[in-house]
Amino acid sequence: MRRSAITLESEISDTERNALFAVMKNLSLKGTHLEIGTAAGGTLCEIYNFYKSSDREIPNFWVVDPMQYFPDQLDIVKKNLISNGVNLASVRFLESLSSIAIKKAFIENPVFDFILIDGSHKRKYVTQDLIWTRFLKKGGILCAHDYSSRFPGVQKSIDLFLKKYKNYKLISVTESLIVIRKMDTTKSSEITNMMMITAAVDGFIHQIRSSINKRVSTKNSHT
């Protein structure tokens, strides 16, 4: 059982959340908030409580998660939200992989003020998650957790995204939370097919290298 399933706490540290809220308090983010990867719903609860404690309008939320992180995840998430005063009617759950859930977005064309990516650490999936930025409004906030050298799939995906899309501005990096603002609309859609192919190939190569290194390490330990 994952620790967050027991504690129901956010997997984002207090320091990271405080840095995020320091940015958010100076912005008017009244539109829908998207969370990709929710664990036990702890971070959503923290964001909700931030708005409530600062007497701000509480936005609606979308949660994208296959709900397979730990047993009974969806039920645990809902109970956690309710215990924190969150009205479940304001939360839309898309219980599927990000790559599947986004098909609904292409049909409905939503607009998000805030996107938090905290799902798979593999480069292929982080790149897929970044497709959701097509629906992030000008002036909106994009965050990604586990942005560090410990998770090269996350770090490389975000770095390449910022390098390609100059209309996104790096605001802060605190521990492993990166905060980015969309300063202008994107002339062409975020994340091209070539970027997806490159991410998949790069991830495959990384997996092979990791497997080889692990085997070599195991072999050396027995010699």
List each language-model region with its residue ranges.
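S-adenosylmethionine/decaboxylated-SAM
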Residues: 2-7, 11, 17-223
